[in-house]
C-alpha cells in the first residue's frame, strides 16, 4: 500500500493533573511528582487532524458530577496468582492440631470448671492475653508490610469503599500467609483464653449465651486490607460510620472465619454433651437465629474489631492506644449459633480443588482395582446347571390327526398293490425252480424291498400307477381326446353361464312395475345367422361445365339423348320406339355433316357412337348396384372396350387440334364460339 493511504494515529492526549485532597510534606510531594505523569502545558491542547480509530473509554468530569475526583492508580505489574491448595492443606493441618489440643484441655478442666466462680483475675488475664496477641499481630504486620507511596495514601483517604476491590488476590494470599505464620504464636494465647472462658461459664450460668466463646473467638479481622494500606502515621478520622465497619466485615477472608467457626462449634457441642444441665439455656439460641449478614453486623457493634484494625494498621502508636482502650477491649460473644448450612457452603467454596483431587484419586484407584480383578480368573462358586430337556410337542388336533391317518392308509394301499404285482411275477418264475419254502422267503424279501422303495420319495420320482397329466395327454389316442372334448363341452353347456346375484337394493320392498316387467333375454349359442348389407355406395356427380369441357360434341349429344330418354315415361317408349330412333337419326346426320372430311374417313370415330347407343339402352333398362356392376365388369369385356374406344377418340381429337384440321382460321374461331355458346 502507498504511504498516502495509511492513516496516521494521533498521539493520546495527556490527562489533567488531579487535585490533592490533603497537603503533603516536601519529600512526599517530590516522590509523587516523580511518579506522576508530566503536567500538561498551560495553553490549549493541540486538536488532532484526524479522528482516532477507537475512542478512549474514560469517565469525564461532567458524567461523574465531580470535577475534582481522585482516580485509583493502576498497578504497573500484574499480581502473581498463587496456588491455594498448599495453603489450604497447611491451614487444615494447623487447625486439626489446635483442635486436638483444645479437646485435651477441655477434658482435663471440665470437672473443675463447674465448681469455680468468676474472678476478676481471670478477666484481667483474658484482657492481657488479647492485648498481647494484638501487639504480636501488629509487629508481624510491620515486618511483612512494605512502605506504600504517598499517592496510595491519598487514594485511601479519598475512597475507602473501593479499597477491598482493588487487589483481592494479594489480600487473600497475605491473609493466608499470616494465618500460617502466626498459628504457633496463637497456641499459647488460646489456652489462656479457654481457661478464662471456662471460669466465666462456671461463675455465672445465666450468661451462657454471652460468654460461651473465649476472648479471641470472634469474627475475624481483615488484616490484609491494613497490609495493603501500609503503616499510616495518623489514625483515620473519627467520622467513620457503622456502614464502613459493615463493609469491612463483609470483605474479610473466609478461611479464618471457617477455622474459628469450626472451633466454636466443636467446643459448644462438647460442652453441651458433657454438661446436660445447660441444655435448657441453649433453647433460646434457636429462637434468635437470623441471617448471615445480620449475624456478622450485630455481633460486634463498636467492640474490639475497630480497635484491632486500627492497631494492626498503626504500629508506631500501639502502646498509646492500648492504654486508652483497655476498657473497651472486652471480647463479645455472639448470641446466635451459626448455621450448619452456612458452614457447609463456606467449606465447599474454600476447598474445591482438594475435593476434586480426592475424587480423581479415588476414581483412579477404583479403575486400577477393577482392571486387576478383570485379569484374574474367577472360579465359579456354584456349578452350572444343566440345560432342561426339550419340550414335548403338543398333540395335533383331531382334523390334523385324521388327515395324517388318511395319508398313511393311502400310502400303504399303494405300496401293497405295487408289492403284490411284483410279487406275483416273481413267484411265477421262482415256482418252477425252487420249492414252496424258497418261494415264501423270496416273497417276503420282495415285499420288504417294495415297501422300502415306496417309503423314501426322492425328487423326480413318480408312482408307476399314476402318470403326470402332461404325459397322459401325449400318450392318449385322438379318439380319447375327442371324447374328453365332448365331455368338457357338455359340462360347459349344462353349467350356468354365471352366478346370478341378488340386487343390492332395499329389502322388503317391491320393485317398480317398469323394472319388474322386464324379461330376461336368453341367447342360443348353437344357432348362427348371417346377414349381408351394403356398408357404402359410390355416387359421382360432375358439374355440367366440366363435362362439356372434357367431352366432345358427339358425347354431349349422347348425354342429352340419355336425359331425354329418362324423362320420357316407359309406356311412351314401348308405343313409339321407332319415333325415337327417327328422331335420333336426323340429329346424328346433322353432326356428321358438320364434321370435316378427315373425320369421315376414320372408322374408329363411328364405333363409339354405335356402341354407346347399344350400351345406353342396356344400362337404362336396369339400374345395377355397385357390387353387381363390379361383378358384371369382371365377367364381360364391354367396359374395357368402351374405355379403349374413348381413349382412341381423345387421341384423334388432340391430333386434329394440333395439326390444324380446320381449313381457315375463321372456321376454327366459329367452332370455338359455338362450343362456348353451348356451354
UniProtKB/Swiss-Prot annotation:
Q: Where is this region: Interaction with SH3 domain of ABP1?
A: 383-396
Q: Which residues carry this modification: Phosphothreonine?
A: 18, 58, 85, 277, 552
Polar residues: compositionally biased ranges: 86-95, 133-149, 164-178, 296-323, 414-427, 437-452, 483-492, 603-613
* A cellular component annotation (GO) from this entry: actin cortical patch
Q: Where is this region: Disordered?
A: 1-95, 107-522, 548-679
On whether Phosphoprotein is a keyword of this UniProt record, the answer is yes
Quote the biased-composition stretches of kind Basic residues, using this chain's numbering.
Answer: 109-119, 501-512
Q: What does this protein do?
A: Involved in mitochondrial migration along actin filaments.
What keywords would UniProt list here? Cytoplasm, Cytoskeleton, Phosphoprotein
Instruction: Kindly state the subunit structure of this protein.
Output: Interacts with ribosomes. Interacts with ABP1.
Q: Where in the cell is it found?
A: Cytoplasm, Cytoskeleton, Actin patch
Signal peptide span: none
Basic and acidic residues biased stretches: 9-19, 179-213, 243-272, 339-351, 372-383, 471-482, 556-576, 667-679
One Pfam family recorded for the sequence: Aim21
Q: In which family does this protein belong, per the annotation? A: Belongs to the AIM21 family.
Chief place where the protein resides: cytoplasm
Q: What is this protein called?
A: Altered inheritance of mitochondria protein 21
Task: Write down which residues bear the modification named Phosphoserine.
Answer: 36, 70, 104, 183, 206, 231, 284, 324, 576, 620, 623, 625, 627, 667, 671, 675, 678
